[in-house]
Structure formats: C-alpha cells, structure tokens
C-alpha cells in the first residue's frame, strides 16, 4: 500500500493539471513557448501517474477499472465488480 503522502501528492498534481489545462492548450495554439515554460512543472499532464484508487499502488494499474490487478482479483472473487467473473473453459 502506498504512503498517504504519495496519494496526496498525486491528487495535488491532478488538481494542478486540471487548473492549467485551458491555459496550456491556448499557449500551445499561440506558439507562446516561453509562457508555457513558465507554468508550474506539476501542471504538465506528463507528470501524472496512474494509481489504484483503493491502495495507491502504481504498478499493475488496470485503466478500465481504475484499480490495481490485485484489488481487481480480490473484488472480482467477492463479486463486487459487475460483469466480471472467473474464467472457466
């Protein structure tokens, strides 16, 4: 499980990206790269990293569900993920 500080840092970055998204698009369209460079580093969407919503785990993230593979397996076996069931053939 990720530290609470890591989860908080990612959340803070996501908020910063959302705050500057319109300004970033406008500056790119104008070609004003000096002003674009002056924006905060964490306002860049490239710096975001996908994390499990439950545990904060960064590896094994499954985008479709927004959780890690481990949590998906546990939740699917308990029947908490609609439409997902154990394969049998």
Swiss-Prot record:
Keyword list (alphabetical) reads: Ribonucleoprotein, Ribosomal protein, RNA-binding, rRNA-binding
Q: Which GO MF terms does the UniProt record name?
A: rRNA binding; structural constituent of ribosome
Under the heading SUPFAM superfamilies, the entry gives: Glucocorticoid receptor-like (DNA-binding domain) (SSF57716)
Output the Gene Ontology cellular-component terms: cytoplasm; small ribosomal subunit
Q: Does the keyword Ribosomal protein apply?
A: yes
> Biological process GO terms, please?
translation
The record, for PANTHER family, names:
30S RIBOSOMAL PROTEIN S14 (PTHR19836), SMALL RIBOSOMAL SUBUNIT PROTEIN US14M (PTHR19836:SF19)
Relate the assembly described in the record. Part of the 30S ribosomal subunit. Contacts proteins S3 and S10.
| HAMAP family hit by this protein | Ribosomal_uS14_1 (MF_00537)
Would you identify the family this protein belongs to, as annotated?
A: Belongs to the universal ribosomal protein uS14 family.
Q: What does this protein do?
A: Binds 16S rRNA, required for the assembly of 30S particles and may also be responsible for determining the conformation of the 16S rRNA at the A site.
Q: What is this protein called in UniProt? A: Small ribosomal subunit protein uS14
**Which species is the source of this protein?**
Azobacteroides pseudotrichonymphae genomovar. CFP2
Gene name as annotated: rpsN
């Amino acid at each position: 499980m990720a530290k609470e500080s890591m989860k908080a840092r990612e959340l803070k970055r996501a908020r910063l990206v959302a705050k500057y998204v319109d300004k970033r698009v406008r500056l790119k369209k104008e070609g004003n790269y000096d002003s674009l460079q002056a924006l905060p580093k964490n306002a860049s969407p490239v710096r975001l990293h996908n994390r499990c919503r439950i545990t904060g785990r960064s590896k094994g993230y499954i985008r479709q569900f927004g959780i890690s593979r481990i949590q998906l397996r546990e939740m699917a076996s308990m029947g908490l993920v609609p439409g997902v069931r154990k394969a049998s053939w």
